[in-house]
Amino acid sequence: IMPSKACTISGSTSLINFAYINEDSYLTRLQMLAPLTFKNITLQVWQIAANGHALTFDEGVTVVSKYTSGGNDIAGIRNIWGGTDSSSDVASSDITIKSGQFGWICGGSGSTGAVIGTAKITMSGGTVNGSIFGGGYEGACGNTEVVMSGGTTCWIYGGGEKGNVTGTSKLTISNTAAITENIFGGSDSGTCGNTEVNVSGGTFAYGIYGGCFTGQVTGFSKVIVTGGNFSGTIYGGGFGKKCGQGDSRDANLGKVGKTEVHVSGLTNGEVSVFGGGLYADVTGNTQVTINTGKYNHIYGSGYVESPYNPAHIGGDVTVTFNDGET
């Protein structure tokens, strides 16, 4: 049983080992009862449900326990939920990561329980081998906020996995953050009210999407990019689903209400900018503003690969080119 008062579990060096096991000596899920900080310690932990309590991985945390993914054994805490792993709701959640290794992190809950207020994740170090979700695996959140200034992750979402965000999901990326896959302001398959993505630094391999993967943004998606080591593509909208000839296209996948994209300071000439989505529609207006920099292509519309993937825009398309070149 974990402490019922705020606690720091630390060692004089990271060689000190903390293992959370059940009566049969198997690694088991840690249920938090109060705010908890790990520092200068080696961990053997399977999963953590923070239950709405502040969870911090301070400097000097190393995780040696392993989980299986894709047939491989990977060192890290497999799952962390800022909310609950049940149908119980919490007022808010707060996860801070400065070191350590992890599989999947959700600011929200692992089951149907909601985070009524804001679910927040702050990452300045450490490694996430899977994905970061500001929201829940299933449960809804009022708002979400993900701030990443360092460390490494594969995918990162401002919103949830299946879980909805009824208000606004915010994603801020800066400094030395490294993302090896795509960036989404919204959810994977859940919905969001609005999304905001602000990128001022970091290193990126693929795309920045203001919207969701296949989930919907019912209001607006706003993307502001002012820096970063990046050679991919910026989309104001969502990803959607690629269709081939004869496929039935679901126009709701990745759909966004309206978009704004503001870009400046990217100078390598390799980045393309779209006001809309990749394979996803925008029902209202799109607006792209270029302030400075050098770019590959700039479109106020969505990406149009073929007649089977039109990425429709339902409203007006506006491109404002204040300065820069293509």
Predicted regions and their residues:
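Glycine-centered low-complexity coil/loop motifs and glycine-rich tracts
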Residues: 44-46, 80-89, 104-116, 131-141, ...
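Generic detector of ordered, mature protein regions
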Residues: 20-22, 43, 51, 169, ...
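All-beta strand scaffolds that present successive hydrophobic residues in beta-strands
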Residues: 8-11, 37-40, 55-74, 90-98, ...
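Extracellular beta-strand-rich solenoid/capping regions of secreted or surface-exposed proteins
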Residues: 2-8, 16-60, 72-73, 82, ...
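Short intrinsically disordered, low-complexity coil segments enriched in acidic
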Residues: 1-11, 299-300, 326
